[in-house]
Amino acid sequence: GPMGIMGPRGPPGASGAPGPQGFQGPAGEPGEPGQTGPAGARAGEDGHPGKPGRPGERGVVGPQGARGFPGTPGIPGFKGHNGIDGIKGQPGAPGVKGEPGAPGENGTPGQAGARGIPGERGRVGAPGPAGARGSDGSVGPVGPAGPIGSAGPPGFPGAPGPKGEIGPVGNPGPAGPAGPRGEVGIPGISGPVGPPGNPGANGITGAKGAAGIPGVAGAPGIPGPRGIPGPAGAAGATGARGIVGEPGPAGSKGESGNKGEPGAAGPQGPPGPSGEEGKRGPNGEPGSTGPAGPPGIRGIPGADGRAGVMGPAGSRGASGPAGVRGPNGDSGRPGEPGIMGPRGFPGSPGNIGPAGKEGPVGIPGIDGRPGPIGPAGARGEPGNIGFPGPKGPSGEPGKPGDKGDAGIAGARGAPGPDGNNGAQGPPGPQGVQGGKGEQGPAGPPGFQGIPGPAGTAGEVGKPGERGIPGEFGIPGPAGARGPPGESGAAGPAGPIGSRGPSGPPGPDGNKGEPGVIGAPGTAGPSGPSGIPGERGAAGIPGGKGEIGNPGRDGARGAPGAVGAPGPAGANGDRGEAGAAGPAGPAGPRGEVGPAGPNGFAGPAGAAGQPGAKGERGPKGENGPVGPTGPVGAAGPSGPNGPPGPAGSRGDGGPPGVTGFPGAAGRTGPPGPSGISGPPGPPGAAGKGDQGPVGRAGETGASGPPGFAGEKGPSGEPGTAGPPGTPGPQGIIGAPGIIGIPGSRGIPGVAGSIGEPGPIGIAGPPGARGPPGAVGAPGVNGAPGEAGRDGNPGSDGPPGRGYPGNAGPVGAVGAPGPHGPVGPTGKRGEPGPVGSVGPVGAVGPRGPSGPQGVRGHNGIQGIPGIAGQHGDQGAPGSVGPAGPRGPAGPTGPVGKDSGQPGTVGPAGVRGSQ
């Protein structure tokens, strides 16, 4: 039909459920191995948790993540009548993502809006050649913040954030028991190399990234041939999500944009009703460990971080068997730092930190190219029949349809009432066939038809070709620094769980401003022809009536009842995507719905542009003293100092007490071999009494440096010294270098079809869309049931056809009652035709004569001029019923099928 005028924009949708949790980012590069400290005498007892340290400085806002996978298409619902295609509005500017709120209850459903008037049926034209792709449009103005949409697909993991502050070394925990072996998952692609260093405490939640770039809306396909409209059926249940299409390849890295001025925050929208909390999904099977990634590049050593929160005391592990003591080895020089080890297992996600303040609105990104079209989902069950709507305006009469198949002869009808006695007249001449009567006026809407059987489901479409990668968006400005939050204890990353069921949809939001009319999209290919409807039941044939006098033209009869709708045709191929329209204003921001389930892990996306560095905050106060750390490893020995000048030899003092053995010195260079002296005489092997301990002698002058002696055996490890005092707080380290972007990952496994969601609230009627191309003529439908008898029409003027050939003389009828015999006169010449006199009273009916032989059809006369409709006369008095006459012959099968009836009233729009 022709394009309708765009109606007012519907109210914005309610806040959708927040998107599923993003994928676990790649694990950071392990830090450099520290030097091995001396072994302790035994494992120390677990210390008590210390006071929480001061939260770290807020990190720099990371770049916007790559666009998420396209959503899976839902199962198509029961096909309704072809509606009027509305003009597609312009996509609004992406709104600022709100903070997740607590799940609320479902709001009360709004009243269903009236359905729009269906447009006239057009004929489907042949699909035109595909046009060349247009150039990307310019970026539209920034609109106000729009409502939060429904939960989108999980996004790609963003680039690794800046390096956190190095926390103090924690006490080694005992080894936990080995977990059960997980099922083999899809091998992941190595993520980008993160900056080295020990993980710092959880930072404050970063500012929310801007919403993803909206995809280009596809153009509406060419409407298929329109059948006789039946009543509007209720919408089927929302289908489950279809299989996720293959993601397109990652686009090339864009150049860094200039830092933009922070935009003004949008107005706070009124809070919508909270949605009902969805069921929690089952825990997924733990995935198997992926292959170890390549060793990363050594990062810049980070500055000392602030003390992190002490983790809970772990249970003490079982003591291992005592090892056999090995021989003492030579003391070697400190070795070079070893090669980076393989990446460790991903840790479980830590506790969620407090939400930071909302950042300013970012610059909207450039529209991305359309993604691949997903395969068509399975066909849904037919919906319930809706209530008939109010009567719509009468449409223009349609063109006469093609000749339908002849119906089966029906059973004999019940006998009709006896007619009035008519005067027996002589058989008149065979009249010529009159011209076709005028089209009757549209009748009242027919009864609601029985819905036809569901059509066969279309074949599942093949996955579309990989889309052109979209351009990277301009990084948004850095958000204002939020207040320091409590540091959360970083726990180990757990396995990614399986996808849970979708949460219930949120209620509709407030009404937004109408969008600007976008350019009409290109026409898609025509859909396949629908399945012909079933043949209707044959009508009951009427009894043979007596041949009456030829009546005058009747008034227009009422159209027949609308036949039952035929089965729905298969879904047509999806048309090519049209160009995106300019952005329209976004509606007010709605409240956040309940949290959605975790999605499947997807491949790591390419790293975006680094965000602008935030301003350095004021230096915080010194936090409380943390728990005593373990004794650090001994550092390498320093170099020997230069020898001092030789002093004069002092007097020998009395022998001093034996001091503690000193630390072994560095092994000096071997001295020259001395000359062997003569052997001395053997001394007497006696032992005297031990004398008293002498007092300590005066320190003598430093003698010349002696040669280094032989290395003594390694001593037993000493007892742990007292804990050292905590050192001063170090400066905050510079953010680490952004890692190399990883290669594109393998697309994730398609999720299973979820449970159908609850029936949504009916939205307002859509605007009248542009007229579609003329469709191909559809398959002839089965002949409809016979229409109801129309009201008797008023008499028209007599026609002026040529007289037909005289028919054969019929058999002589039975003699009537004798009347008075008049004188027989000569037959006069026919006089002029007199005006029609008033209808006389009905005389008594004479006996019917035998049926005459049917005459041949006369030559068709010239159609007479259609007369004006006369006023309907008052009904005459009914005469007494005469005896029933013999049944007349069955008439020939009609040729033309009736004109289609008027379009029935629009039904109440079904729920989604």
Swiss-Prot record:
Tissue expression profile of the protein: Forms the fibrils of tendon, ligaments and bones. In bones, the fibrils are mineralized with calcium hydroxyapatite.
Composition bias type Gly residues, residue spans: 431-440, 539-548, 647-656
Keywords: Calcium, Collagen, Extracellular matrix, Hydroxylation, Repeat, Secreted
Biased composition (Basic and acidic residues): 43-57
Record's GO cellular component terms: collagen type I trimer; extracellular space
GO MF, one example: extracellular matrix structural constituent conferring tensile strength
Stretches with biased composition (Low complexity): 1-41, 124-153, 178-192, 229-244, 295-327, 360-382, 406-424, 474-501, 517-532, 549-612, 622-637, 658-667, 728-739, 763-785, 805-815, 830-850
Post-translational modification: Prolines at the third position of the tripeptide repeating unit (G-X-Y) are hydroxylated in some or all of the chains.
One example of a Gene Ontology biological process annotation: extracellular matrix organization
Region named Disordered: 1-206, 222-739, 763-912
Cellular localisation: Secreted; Secreted, Extracellular space; Secreted, Extracellular space, Extracellular matrix
Transmembrane segments: none
InterPro entries, alphabetized: Collagen (IPR008160), Collagen_superfamily (IPR050149)
Subunit structure, as described in the record: Trimers of one alpha 2(I) and two alpha 1(I) chains. Interacts (via C-terminus) with TMEM131 (via PapD-L domain); the interaction is direct and is involved in assembly and TRAPPIII ER-to-Golgi transport complex-dependent secretion of collagen.
Primary role: Type I collagen is a member of group I collagen (fibrillar forming collagen).
Similarity-based family: Belongs to the fibrillar collagen family.
Miscellaneous information on this protein: These protein fragments were extracted from fossils. The tryptic peptides required multiple purification steps in order to eliminate contaminants and to increase the concentration of peptidic material.
Name this polypeptide is given: Collagen alpha-2(I) chain
Species: Equus sp
